[in-house]
Amino acid sequence: MKVLWAALLVAFLAGCQGKMEPELEREPELEREPELHQQADWQSGQPWELALGRFWDYLRWVQTLSEQVQEELLSSQVTQELTALMDETMKELKAYKSELEEQLSPVAEETRARLSKELQAAQARLGADMEDVRSRLAXYRSEVQAMLGQSXDELRARLASHLRKLRKRLLRDVDDLQKRLAVYQAGAREGAERGVSAIRERLVPLVEQGRARAATVGSSLAGQPLQERAQAWGERLRARMEEVGSRTRDRLDEVKEQVEEVRAKLEEQAQQMRLQAEAFQARLKSWFEPLVEDMQRQWAGLVEKVQAAVGASAAPVPGDNH
């Protein structure tokens, strides 16, 4: 009897465990349908939605908790892949947001600030929930490594439950973000149309004025004979050329007068310089002439003295007669 009860208990536990394994990999069909619908939209959406679709596909693969997934979860490969996909998604999302902000320039500052604040909050929620996914997988890896070979069925079940909840939160975040972006894009489109309308309102009166002026000139010209119009053009051209010639002659006369003034000034300055040079030369002559005359007198006296001394030494000396 005890053996029978033991066999029944073993069979029951094996059935429970066998039922648990597919449960980790299986998702309710009602939950999967909206995900598939949203994923189809992501595949044909903006670049940030395509990046989000790649992140979602990788997360679905992780949630299967297959043997390969469990092996990679024990290393840092899964978290590294998720980090790269998260960074790519947020980068594309920021680029798309910046593009919409440029298109929102014609919109009022208050409206643009409010839309930007709401969109930034939705973007932050999506980033936080994606970060929760990565943190939860990192925590699972730490818990598995700490068990040291013990059974990890309970950890896998708890991880699968957490991942399902996080995926639901991510779906809500993405839906909210898409709605905010749609409002943002509608505001940008409205602002662009408003800017074009304002430009059109300013240009239409100018175009009408130009048309009216062209029509007036055309009608006045059409009413004149061709010969009269040619004569009128010739008279205007002749008057214009005479005006240009008169201005040119006046300008040449001014240049000639300026040249004459410059030449007269140069001649005057040259004459002044000649007079100054002659006066300086006369002053030098008056300085040095007395000195030269004095030197000449001294030299003549010296020569006379030398000649006298030479003559005296050359005179014969009388000898003794013995």
Swiss-Prot record:
Residues 84-260 are annotated as: 8 X 22 AA approximate tandem repeats. Sequence repeats lie at residues 84-105, 106-127, 128-149, 150-171, 172-193, 194-215, 216-238, 239-260. The modification Phosphoserine is found at residue 151. Residues 162-172 are annotated as: LDL and other lipoprotein receptors binding. Heparin binds at residues 166-169, 234-241. APOE is an apolipoprotein, a protein associating with lipid particles, that mainly functions in lipoprotein-mediated lipid transport between organs via the plasma and interstitial fluids. APOE is a core component of plasma lipoproteins and is involved in their production, conversion and clearance. Apolipoproteins are amphipathic molecules that interact both with lipids of the lipoprotein particle core and the aqueous environment of the plasma. PANTHER family: APOLIPOPROTEIN, APOLIPOPROTEIN E. This is Apolipoprotein E. The gene is APOE.
